[in-house]
Design a protein with these regions (language model features):
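N-terminal Rossmann NAD(P)H-binding glycine-rich loop of SDR-like oxidoreductase domains
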Residues: 4-25
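NAD(P)H-binding glycine-rich loop region in Rossmannoid oxidoreductase-like domains
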Residues: 38, 48-86
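Glycine-rich NAD(P)-binding loop of the Rossmann-fold in SDR/ketoreductase-type enzymes
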Residues: 49, 66, 82-93, 101, ...
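Catalytic helix-loop patch of NAD(P)-dependent Rossmann-fold dehydrogenases
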Residues: 85, 121-168
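Conserved Rossmann-fold NAD(P)-dependent oxidoreductase catalytic core, especially the SDR/UDP-sugar
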Residues: 93-140
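Flexible, glycine-rich beta-alpha linker
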Residues: 114-116, 145, 163-189
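Alpha-helical substrate-binding/gating segment
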Residues: 162, 173-180, 192-213, 220
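Conserved C-terminal active-site "lid" loop/helix of NAD(P)H-dependent oxidoreductases
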Residues: 213-215, 220-238
């Protein structure tokens, strides 16, 4: 049985369920979600906007090492009040609880929407051949309140590392699709992050020697416009899938 304990917040969401299925062999898994399903000893119902609920959950998991923080409002068009409470306040609450409980590392689900305005409004960069790659060194250009909330989450992660030594990896996640099919939308040909590349990226983010980093989460798509060279060199991310090579569903 794995000896390192991992808590996944937002464990019932799309990314949470993918990670839960594929990381169970590597970590002793625990989950946190605002929604309730069948009772399980290793999944806790909690609201991340309520610090006492987070602290109570972490207090019930002795020797917890890692957190993958996915919980929050995932809507790209979410209003300010929601992202302020759930994504900004909720992320701050997770990091503060992690600090208080001696967690080693948090992997924070940031988003490509931290720099979404580079794609154009509405997005059109995916229609261009050989565009300049967007890197983590480019200035932030969020394309809405959701993007702002993820920029703020990255800043929270940085502060908790600099002030308290709480290790963090921030992943600017691309398009993770329920059916794992990048051909349902032209933009996905550029932005798709396959399920197996997602799992690899998160696992390597948890175990890498790097103490803090920000990386784009995207497969090795021929038409991608996000730079992953730092993820390759720093955490040994080796994406296996390319939207241009994936099988199209039979009509």
């Amino acid at each position: 049985m794995p000896d390192q304990k991992l808590l996944i917040t937002g464990c019932y969401g799309l990314i949470g369920t993918i990670l839960w299925e594929h990381l169970a062999d590597s970590f002793e898994l625990y989950g946190l979600d605002i929604h309730s399903r069948e009772p399980k000893d290793n999944i806790f119902q909690a609201d991340i906007t309520k610090p006492e609920q987070i602290n109570n959950t972490l207090g019930r998991i002795p020797s917890l090492t890692y957190i993958v923080h996915l919980a929050g409002d995932p809507r790209m068009d979410a209003d300010w009040d929601s992202v302020y409470s759930n994504n900004i306040g909720g992320t701050k609450n997770i990091y503060e609880a992690a600090r208080l409980h001696g967690i080693k590392r948090v992997v924070f689900a940031s988003s490509n929407h931290t720099t979404g305005a580079y794609e154009g409004l509405p997005p059109s960069l995916h229609t261009k051949d050989n565009p300049n790659l967007i890197t983590i060194n480019d200035p932030i250009r969020p394309d809405g309140f959701y993007g702002i909330s993820k920029v703020t989450g990255e800043a929270i992660a940085r502060m908790y590392y600099d002030l308290f030594g709480l290790e963090s990896i921030c992943l600017r996640i691309g398009s993770v699709l329920r059916d794992d099919n990048p051909h349902s939308n032209p933009r996905y040909e550029s932005t798709w992050l396959s399920h197996r590349d997602l799992v690899q990226l998160v696992k390597k983010s948890l175990l890498a020697d790097v103490k803090f980093g920000i990386y784009y989460g995207v497969s090795k798509n021929k038409r991608r416009f996000w730079d992953i060279s730092n993820a390759v060199s720093e955490i040994n991310y080796q994406p296996e899938d390319d939207a241009s090579h994936s099988l199209r569903p039979q009509s």
